[in-house]
Amino acid sequence: MSKHLAITKFRPANWLQKAGYAPQVFLFRNLESGQVLYSQFPTFSWKQIDTNFQRPNWENKKPSTRRDIWKCMAVVDLPDYDKSVKVYQNLCRLRYLRDVTFSKQAKDMRKKNESGHTWYSSQYRPTYSQEAVADLRECLLKLKDVQSSIKVHWEDEWRMGDKEKYWNPVLPELNHTTLERLGNVSREESAILKELGERAKEEFARVRQQESAAQNISL
């Protein structure tokens, strides 16, 4: 099965591991609109667009899959594949609540311009990335007991928000780092994400080996 076909479906934990992916979740930011896309993979397709944007409107149009207008905003390394699937699913559920179930309430809480519309500059609405960060924090709070085993690689320090105000009080042991990059080049970003994936798989294998050794000793 080609990589492109593989990412057009939701994938369970066992499949991700067998296919050679790392236990990660990816957040991509649209450079033109500010919208954020969630993916189980270091890339995305129309499938992720359809899943993430189920109730598009003129303020929140269904975005294009053009790779040059998307930039990786964050990569989350999880301790195992089940948790990576759980975080991805919860992010998608929270997006559905914001865009469909409680769309009016969500819009009421957003910063408005003089016309009463969600504030924007040109086509860019910063509220979408802010909401994505808030939702990610909410999802990781569900894994508070294993927070020291979770690492979030951010596009930059500014993107995560105020660490002392929003993160440390509730997730003090969560690991934060920033993505190493020289510029906004898709090929370079792809290489960085591939390297992060390899590191995450190595860490997963190392932890499992330690757990297996500890179990053998206890027996």
UniProtKB/Swiss-Prot annotation:
Biological processes per GO annotation: mitochondrial genome maintenance
Sorted UniProt keywords: Mitochondrion, Nucleus, Ribonucleoprotein, Ribosomal protein, Transcription, Transcription regulation
GO cellular component assignments: mitochondrion; nucleus; ribonucleoprotein complex; ribosome
InterPro entries per the UniProt record, alphabetical: Ribosomal_mL67
Compartments in which it is found: Nucleus; Mitochondrion
Tagged with keyword Hydrolase: no
Taxonomic superkingdom: Eukaryota
Entry GO MF terms: DNA strand exchange activity; single-stranded DNA binding; structural constituent of ribosome
Family assignment from sequence similarity: Belongs to the mitochondrion-specific ribosomal protein mL67 family.
Task of the protein: Transcription factor involved in regulation of RNA polymerase II-dependent transcription. Also involved in regulation of mitochondrial DNA recombination, maintenance and repair, and generation of homoplasmic cells.
Descriptive protein name: Large ribosomal subunit protein mL67
Gene name linked to the record: MHR1
